[in-house]
C-alpha cells in the first residue's frame, strides 16, 4: 500500500485537535491536515476544578466522523493527552464522577505528608520521577482521604488517553509513557509500585500492567461499519513530542514548549543519583525503552492566563510591542507554585515583582516581557543543570510544539543558553503520535527512522546566540528573586 491515513487525537490542557496524516511510503512524504479543533477548559463541579470529558469525547467522535464522511479509509487512530489526570470507573465500566484537574487545590499539603511518611529519597529511588504537588500519587491520596464515599464505587482508574481509547474500543489499557508521570510506576520493574500505591489508599486492582507504545488496544467501528484499530501511542503528549524532535545527536537537548515547557534529553538509562534528586530531575518513560530525562517548567501558561484575563487576541502585535522593551527589568521565578492557578495572574506577577523590590510591570507588553525574560533565564539555568548531571555540555537545543512559533522567545532562549536553537516542528505531539502508528503499521522501522521523515518534511528555523545581548550578559547573575516555595520541590 502506497498511502496510509492515520488520525491523531491530540488533547492539550487548553484545546484539542483531531488531525489527519497522509503518509506516502514510496516517497516518504508526510502531511498533516487539521480536521477538527475544539476548546478544553476547566469547570467548577461541587467545588472542584474538573474536566468536561463528555464534551471532549463528543468532539473526538465528531472529528473522527468528519474524516470518515470524506470517504477516507482510516488505517489507525492514536490518542495523546497531558499527564497525571485520570478517570474513575465502576464495575460496569461507567464513569464515577468527573475527573478532577491537576490544577485543583485538593492536593495542597499532600506531597509533604508523603515526604514525611515514606521519605523523599525512597519515593525517588522507586519511581525516578520529579516531585510535583499534583502528581497522580498525591491526587489519589487526596481522593481516598477526602472522598471515601466516591472511592467505594471505584473498580478501575484510567489515565486520560486510556479513558478515551476505552470509550472508542471498549478495551482498557494503561500506556507506559503516561503511566510513568503518575510517580507510581517502579522504575526497575515498569509496573505499579506496591508500596507507593498502598500509601495512596487506591487498590492495585484499579490498574492493569502498563503496556509500552505500539500495541493495538482494540477497534473503533466507524459510521460506515469499518473496524479501525486504535493504537496505544506514546500517549503522554510530551513523549509524543520528543519522538518527533529531530535530535541531531547525543549533544542535542529538547524543549517541548506549550502550556508547559519541558526541557531534557534522551537517555538509555535513568538518572536517579542524589544529584538528580537534589535537582528534581524526572525520568519519564519514552518509546523504545528510552528515558526522557527532563525538568518541568511552568511555560506559557502564565502568558495564556494574562491573554485571557486581559482579553488579548492579537498575540503577534503584543510580541512586537514586547520586543521593543529593554530586557530583564522585571524578573520572576516561573516555577514558583504561586503561579499554578492564581485567581489573577497579572496581579500575582506584579506582587512577585513588588515583593522583590523590582519595578512592577503594568502594561500588557511589560507583563509579556517579564514572562519571556524569566522563562529564557530559567531555561538557561536548567540546561546548565542537565549538562552538569550528565557530565557533558549540549551544543544544540530543539524547541518543538506551539511555543516554537514565538520567535522572540526562541532568540531569548538561544542568547540565554548560549547555544544554537532549532525551532520546529510546531505539531510535534501530533507527529509523534502518528509516528508510533506508522511503526505499528510496519511502515517505519523505529524512532530514528521516523525522525528522518520529520526532518525531510518539515522546515526548521535556526536561531544563533548573540553573546552581546542584554539577556546573555544577565545570565551569570540570574537567581530566583526571593525564597519561593517552588512547583518543583
Curated annotation (Swiss-Prot):
User: Keyword Thylakoid: yes or no?
Assistant: no
Q: Which family does it belong to?
A: Belongs to the rhamnulokinase family.
Q: Where does ATP bind?
A: 13-17, 259, 304, 402
The answer to whether the entry has keyword Transmembrane helix is no
Query: Which NCBIfam families does UniProt cross-reference here?
Result: PRK10640.1, rhamnulo_kin
The record's PANTHER family line, in alphabetical order, gives: L-RHAMNULOKINASE, SUGAR KINASE
Q: What does this protein do?
A: Involved in the catabolism of L-rhamnose (6-deoxy-L-mannose). Catalyzes the transfer of the gamma-phosphate group from ATP to the 1-hydroxyl group of L-rhamnulose to yield L-rhamnulose 1-phosphate.
Write the record's keywords in alphabetical order, separated by commas.
Answer: ATP-binding, Disulfide bond, Kinase, Magnesium, Nucleotide-binding, Rhamnose metabolism, Transferase
Q: Which reaction does it catalyse?
A: L-rhamnulose + ATP = L-rhamnulose 1-phosphate + ADP + H(+)
GO term, biological process aspect, one: rhamnose catabolic process
Q: Which organism is it from?
A: Salmonella schwarzengrund (strain CVM19633)
**Record protein name field:** Rhamnulokinase
Q: Which biological pathway?
A: Carbohydrate degradation; L-rhamnose degradation; glycerone phosphate from L-rhamnose: step 2/3
Q: What is its EC number?
A: 2.7.1.5
